Every structure is written in structure tokens, then in C-alpha cells.
């Protein structure tokens, strides 16, 4: 499989200060790519560039071989990149069913929406089981899974997850990561940023360690996880 997403020599930042410095990064089609690193490494900035919320000052961002670095977030969404934010984003007073259906707000083909909803229910049983309950009645981990379901209503080519385990207890984090693994096994390409390096790299087929806006180390997730060069810097603090 080839690269679905490529960042080539990307420099980007805010207010005249660069956070990313000539960054090269690739996401292979069909892979789980996990970015880890200390606070301030530029992980979230990468996701902002990929989703169109921040335009690079230098370099190229290519998706399926086409440049997307100058596109709006909406245009990038239409290209097939869908992001699930770190913050809880469900509408608390709306039902689970209503929240999930809203994921297809750009799809005007009602039969297609119904088919996707059926597929989502098969993948995420909680959507059917709790469909009439308000989103606020769900636990943090359950809400995160419903957010995944909502994102899949757009059938993204690339699913981008910003720290999906943030604020979750270890048991719930395991459930969420098992769900991410299942989505990937079903054919979904996933790019995630994860503060918990052990969990993220243990899940990933490709691991990337960032520091000061650059890629410091990358390779197979398991190899990066066990590399002594980064263990004392990242893993001890984020386990």
C-alpha cells in the first residue's frame, strides 16, 4: 500500500512563530499511524494542518496525490478526511440516534444515509441499544465511541483522532482502543495523536515520535515503543 497522506517539508505555526519545522510525515493507506511526543512537540498542530484549520507557511500537504494545503476545512472534509476532536462534541440533550445521524449532514441521499446508519449500528451496537437516550446519559468512553460512529457516517478515507483516550480510566481506555483497532481491521485508515505513548504505540502499525516540531523517530509501532532512545523521555511520563 502507498501513502494516503503526505506532509513534505511542512513549516507552520501561529502569529509568526513556527511550531512545525520542515516536517516530513506519511500515513500509509490501511494503517494506524500514531503520533506521540511531549507537550509542545507539535502533535496537535499536525492535525490542524491536515484538517485545514492551519495553512502551512512552507511545504506540501498531499492527500491521495493531490495538494490540499490551501483548502478550507469543509473542502478537506469533502475530500474524505474526518476528525474527531479531543473535546467531547456530542449534543448532550439530543439522542444518540440524532447525534449519529448529524454526522451525515453533508449527505443528501436519504437511502445512502440509512444504509450507513445501519452499518454503523452493526459496528457500534451501543448506537442501537442507546439510540433514544440523550447523549448526556452516556459515560465518557461511551460518548467517545458514539463520536466515532458519527464520524463514520461520512465514510471517511482517513479518520483523524485527537487524543481519544484523554480523561478516560484505564479500563475505558482499553475499550476505546479496542474500538479503534476494530475500525482499522474493517479497512479504515487512522491517524491519531495520543498523549499515552504506551497505549498509542502499542496500537499503531506505524509510530511517530515528535519533538520540537520535527520527527525524531519513526517506524513500526512496537519497535518505536521499545526503543530505549525515547523510553526515558516519553513513556515513563505518559504510561
Which residues does each PLM region occupy?
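ABC-type ATPase nucleotide-binding domains, specifically the catalytic core motifs of the NBD
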Residues: 15, 33, 71, 96-115, ...
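Catalytic Walker B motif of ABC-type/P-loop ATPase nucleotide-binding domains
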Residues: 159-163
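Conserved ABC transporter NBD signature motif
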Residues: 59-68, 79, 112-117, 217-219
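Helix-to-loop junction immediately C-terminal to a conserved catalytic motif
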Residues: 51
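Conserved ABC ATPase signature
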Residues: 134-138
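The feature captures the beta-strand-to-loop junction immediately N-terminal to the Walker
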Residues: 36-38
